[in-house]
UniProtKB/Swiss-Prot annotation:
GO terms for biological process: tetrahydromethanopterin biosynthetic process. Transmembrane segments: none annotated. It comes from Thermoplasma volcanium (strain ATCC 51530 / DSM 4299 / JCM 9571 / NBRC 15438 / GSS1). It holds the Pfam family GCHY-1. Its cofactor is Fe(2+). One of its GO terms (molecular function) is GTP cyclohydrolase IV activity. InterPro entries: GTP_cyclohydrolase_FolE2/MptA, GTP_cyclohydrolase_MptA. This is GTP cyclohydrolase MptA. The gene is mptA. Binds 1 Fe(2+) ion per subunit.
Amino acid sequence: MIDFLDVQASTPDIRISVDKVGIRRMKFPIKIGDEVAILSADLYIDIPQTRKGADMSRAVESIQSVLSRPSINLESLGIEICKEALGRFNYASRVEVKINGEYYKKSNGGYDEISLYIRTKCGIDGNIENLTGLSYEAITACPCAMETTRALISKDIPDSENVLYYIPTVTHNQRNRTKLIVSNNAGKISFWDIYKVLESVQGKPLESLLKRIDEGKLVYEAHKKPKFVEDVVREVAFAAVTLLPLSDDDMVIVSSDSEESIHPHNAYASMKKRALDLKKELNL
């Protein structure tokens, strides 16, 4: 009789350590209040040069074990999965977890689609790095085209100059997806806190159902505060360091991606800075 062989534990033909091995896109539902989010997880470990492969089932078990607990804190989900995996993979020195997903938040216009992000790394040295964030689509209006059309209108209608200085004028607008991710090593910053930071700059997510007055208000408000993607990134970063309980070494990562309505390309801006560096630039 041939015994079962632990192939993964055998010595590889080529003895080189592997930095990252694991599973990708393991999907699972998780309840957030009265709604359910569908998340997708990647889990990676490193393996030494003396080991042929990783026990992939342990990656699945690590995720399932945490999800089976009676209460789950979404903000520290990545931390708990990392710790669980580090205990199961006794030959790994570090674990990395990436979680993405879509959460549909009930609103007056149906459901707001919000993308969630969790990025966690932990090691046998006890170090933990946990980043959490979200993004959603909102509307922006271009300030450059607005000032150009303001000048053009004043040439066509000279008597309008006095009024034109005080009202938003014609410009193009676009769907804009802005993402905010921050350090959250203690899991104390809620996704709702991050949402409120984005909302303070971008307003609420775009909705499928808009009645006439709501549509008018949405467009009017966007044109009252026209923004480049650069403006969006700066305003979100400023709101993050003033509204969130971030320590000096915590990271603030912001990106803004606009689907330009008058161009066949997108406009994009991003920044990645420590909270301390942002505060220094802002003289806070």
